[in-house]
Structures are given as structure tokens and as C-alpha cells.
């Protein structure tokens, strides 16, 4: 058992467990959209098309999808590639977390794994439903100060926690205060952005689910980290948004050519803007929070200080 928990083996052991956790997260995301279902009910997984109850080997992450040739064994319906994708992504982030956490800090690692898994779940639900579950956002706001109390190392690199601590080590009380300040900054800045957007454009710039998600994230990464997470999320959202607009522009132009329509590029671009403007912001915030959680020290700090010259 001790050999499995060694620094060289722990990331790979975590990745294997991450595959199975990813399989469970697939169930959570799928059942969130179905009234009357929950992660624990019904107890057995089944094909959403024919209701076939899956055998134990049909639940093996990734491998079962390959063996079944991505089809249900009973009805032959195609099993979406997002299922093995989510399993692999979960395994990857568990591997990264285990690689980043200092050796022997198992409680800190548990917090990291829980937060990263919740962020991944929130991202997939937001992509499907354009909403972020309160169980993740509000639950995160409840859990964050408790985690800060139990694991003060969570805010080891938060300036508020260091300012309130006497020595080099962050105290539990200072860590809890840093968690609350991070939540206030994370939620407050998005509320301000939303109100400014409402005044400038006559509509909310983002949903309240994003506000709660960033507030929850701030509880784990502190006030400075939450600002960097918002910056990273905004950059990735801008890149993806531009790519999405270009994709719709190409689709509109392609359909015009196929139907022998003569429509100007300007009109096609306006159509693409309407069709491609709706993108969930939650996955980008989640990515920013995850990057800060894992790479705030030393990579993002060095990058930020280097950018300031």
C-alpha cells in the first residue's frame, strides 16, 4: 500500500482512480437533465435509448466503449464519444493534481481532486443546459472555508493569509479569512460586471450561476487567484467565441453557395453573430480556477511578475 502512495507512483494510481470517477461523473451529468433521477437513483446504469441495464464489464471506463465498438450491446445505438472523453479528462486532471501536490499532503490532494472533479462536472452541465448546479456552486461556498480550516496549506500562497499570519506558516484562522475574502471578491467582481453589462447593453452580461461558481472558486484560490482565474477564463472564452463566430460564418456562407444565394459577407457575418453569440462562460471560469489551483505557484506568479516587468 505504501508503495502505491510513493511520489513516483501516486500520479498514475490517481489517474486510474480518476478513470472510474470520470465514469461516475458522466452519470451525474446525464442524470442532471432527467427529472426524477439523481446520481444515486436509479442504482444501475442503463442505456438511455432502450433501457438495457449495463453489466459490470460494460461500465469499465474507456475499455468497454472500445470493446463495444461505441454501440449499445442491446439496441446498437451509438454511445457518444463524450463518455470516454470525460473519463480520460478526469484521469488527466487527477494525474496533474497528484503530480503538483507536495509529497505526503494527502488531505490537500483530496481537496484538489474534489474541487477539480466538481469543476469538470459543472463545465459539462453548463455546456448541456446553460446552467451550473447549485449543489456545486453553493456547495463549494460552504465547503471552501471548512477546507481552509482543515487544510490551511490551501491558502499557503494567498497574500491575505500571509498578512494575517505571524510567522512563515499560514494559520488556520488566516486561511479561513482568505477563503471568505476570495469568495467576496470572486462573486463581487462578476456582480459588478453583470450590472455594468446590463446598463451598457440592456441585458445581463452573464448568468448568476457564473457569479456563484467564481465565488466558490475564490474560496479555494483566494482573492488574488480569483482575479487571475477570471482573466484566464476571459481570454479562453474570447478565443473560443471568435472561433465559434468564424465557424458559423463559414456554415452560413457554405449554405448560401449550396442554395445559389447571393448574400453579402456582411449579412452572413451578422447572421453568424446572432447564431454564435451564445456560449456558456462556466467552463472557461472552471478552467481558470483549475489552472490557478494547480499552477499558481510558481508558474502563474512568475508569469504575472514577468508581465509587469
Language model feature labels by segment:
Residues 1-309:
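A membrane-topology feature that recognizes alpha-helical transmembrane segments
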Amino acid at each position: 500500500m505504501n508503495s502505491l502512495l510513493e511520489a513516483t507512483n501516486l500520479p498514475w494510481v490517481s489517474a486510474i482512480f480518476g478513470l472510474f470517477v470520470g465514469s461516475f461523473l458522466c452519470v451525474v451529468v446525464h442524470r442532471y437533465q432527467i427529472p426524477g433521477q439523481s446520481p444515486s437513483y436509479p442504482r444501475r446504469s442503463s442505456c438511455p435509448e432502450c433501457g438495457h441495464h449495463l453489466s459490470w464489464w460494460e461500465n469499465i471506463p474507456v475499455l468497454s466503449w472500445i470493446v463495444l465498438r461505441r454501440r449499445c450491446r442491446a439496441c446498437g445505438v451509438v454511445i457518444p464519444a463524450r463518455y470516454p472523453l470525460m473519463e480520460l479528462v478526469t484521469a488527466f486532471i487527477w494525474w496533474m493534481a497528484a503530480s503538483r501536490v507536495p509529497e505526503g499532503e494527502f488531505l490537500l490532494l483530496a481537496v484538489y481532486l474534489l474541487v477539480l472533479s466538481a469543476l469538470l462536472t459543472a463545465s459539462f452541465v453548463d455546456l448541456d443546459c446553460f446552467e451550473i448546479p447549485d449543489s456545486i456552486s453553493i456547495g463549494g461556498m460552504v465547503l471552501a472555508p471548512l477546507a481552509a480550516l482543515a487544510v490551511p496549506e490551501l491558502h499557503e500562497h494567498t497574500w491575505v493569509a500571509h498578512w494575517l499570519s505571524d510567522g512563515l506558516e499560514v494559520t488556520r484562522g488566516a486561511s479561513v479569512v482568505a477563503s471568505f475574502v476570495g469568495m467576496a471578491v470572486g462573486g463581487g467582481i462578476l456582480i459588478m460586471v453583470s450590472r455594468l453589462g446590463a446598463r451598457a447593453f440592456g441585458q445581463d452580461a452573464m448568468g448568476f450561476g457564473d457569479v456563484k461558481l467564481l465565488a466558490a472558486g475564490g474560496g479555494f484560490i483566494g482573492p488574488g487567484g480569483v482575479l487571475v482565474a477570471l482573466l484566464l477564463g476571459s481570454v479562453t472564452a474570447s478565443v473560443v467565441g471568435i472561433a465559434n463566430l468564424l465557424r458559423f460564418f463559414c456554415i452560413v456562407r457554405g449554405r448560401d453557395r449550396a442554395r445559389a444565394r447571393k448574400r453579402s459577407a456582411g449579412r452572413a457575418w451578422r447572421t453568424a453573430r446572432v447564431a454564435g453569440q451564445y456560449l456558456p462562460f462556466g467552463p472557461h471560469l472552471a478552467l481558470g480556477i483549475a489552472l490557478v489551483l494547480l499552477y499558481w505557484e510558481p508558474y502563474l506568479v512568475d508569469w504575472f511578475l514577468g508581465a509587469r516587468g
